[in-house]
Amino acid sequence: MTKKRLVLWDIDHTLVDFTELGAAWYGTAFTAATGATLRVHPVFGGRTERATTTDLLTANGFEAAEETIQALFKALVAESERHSPTFADTARALPGAAEALAAFAADGDVVQTLVTGNLPEISRHKLAAFGLHEHLDLEIGGYGTLSVHRPDLVPHAVALAAAKHGTEFGADAVVVIGDTPNDVRAAVDNGVVSVGVATGHYSAEELRAEGAHTVLPDLADTDAVRNAVRNTVLS
């Protein structure tokens, strides 16, 4: 019997490219949430939204109180909602992303969801612009609201997937796919498989140095992506 696998996808620079778009929302969202003007801009790089928001508030002279964090989350979702009709024109799905997702969706032994620093609503907006959401179970993802530490998102998603599908996913059956060292560490810290994709700001060598078990140049070769998910072994 074929082993059931759980594939946990990153979004930005793995499946889609929204370069600079998200950063532009923060000025409006910050003012809506705090009444102040944003002076110090956020740093992303595979971090969770909770980490980004916490540091953003502190850097701009505000206490990172939960009420303020939630207000900023709400304002960011509103900005994403407002701009979402233009996403298909201002952003892009990365080569091979749709094909890889569709290939795994056609396999009865693969469950696909997200481990992403994005907020749940923004995740859907970004993916829906290119029809990518159709192949993912977004209800069982690990999102950036949960923790400042990205590795915390992995067991959350695994637990939700196990409960929904009635399957215990062993460490070698959980595959995290992403483009940053933070994606790699999220997998390695939880003892699961890391597949790095060098489609962002980090080279294949940098991802391997962080401990990625397999590194792909991109998602363009669907067979290579499927092979990485099915045949990569933990070392």
Segments and roles (model prediction):
Residues 1-9, 55, 60, 64, ...:
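Non-catalytic pre-domain segments flanking phosphatase-related domains
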